[in-house]
Amino acid sequence: MNTNDTAPPALSGMPNGADTLFLIFLALILVAVVWLGGINFREGQHLEDAKRNGEAWAAWLTEAGTKRMEEDFEPKACAGAGGDEKSGSTWGACVEHLLKESELKGLVNTFHNQALQVIEKCDRGDLSTAGGIRFDNLVPTPPGSAVPMVVNPLKADDSIKGKLQIRVVICDKGGYPIKVAELEF
């Protein structure tokens, strides 16, 4: 057997080429994680702002729902019939008034940096609905029914002269609905 009495070469302690490539790759991955984390944080903030918009609407509707059947309720566009059965208040007139002349007029859809829009449905195929707000009319079914309520979107020509059960929904970035509140109006 041939033995070589030479000692192995001493290592310098410096990274070789493969080590350097690995460290560069690791640094790039770290930068990508921080960058994507920042993007996801901003998107989460947009969603939280949209939820706050929905909560502002829910708070206004809840407060107004306790007083709107009184004769001197303002705004008249959102007043209930009270004693007047001929009152023609509609949901569309109420929403239009609130978007133009109430404290809710300044709400902004942060996904698009535009004025908040009331939409009929959250649509996954139409991403312009992201951050929009939707209102559903919850109609209770008779006791003992398998389904406790029927959910219909509130349309502009729906009458609001009586009490309504309303669900406030906002749309997330992907067009999925997020329930914010259910209230009596």
Kindly give the residue locations of the regions a language model identified.
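Generic cytosolic/nucleocytoplasmic N-terminal low-complexity/intrinsically disordered segments
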Residues: 1-3, 52, 99, 104
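Amphipathic alpha-helical segments typified by the pilin-like N-terminal helix
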Residues: 11-60
